[in-house]
């Protein structure tokens, strides 16, 4: 059974807020590889603390960062 996926919209948010990966690393207290993996969508298990730090740094809601994509019927 197909359940759908979660799309990470970090690149679009960063562009909208005019924020570089380096600045996000600094503001969210994350290392480069973490930010890069979130930007590339290479995350299989989300860390609530990391998501909270990203949302705080970007001044956004969790729903702005993540989107549920239902399975194709």
What residue ranges belong to the model's regions?
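A short, Lys/Arg-rich alpha-helix, primarily the initiator
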Residues: 1-19
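Short alpha-helical DNA-recognition segment
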Residues: 19-37
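Residues within the helices of the helix-turn-helix
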Residues: 11, 22, 52
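Short, basic-rich loop-to-helix N-cap that marks the start of a DNA-contacting helix
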Residues: 42-53
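Short, charged recognition helix plus adjacent turn
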Residues: 37, 66-73
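The alpha-helix within a helix-turn-helix
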Residues: 14, 25, 55
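Residue-level detection of the helix-turn-helix DNA-binding "recognition helix"
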Residues: 15, 29, 40, 70
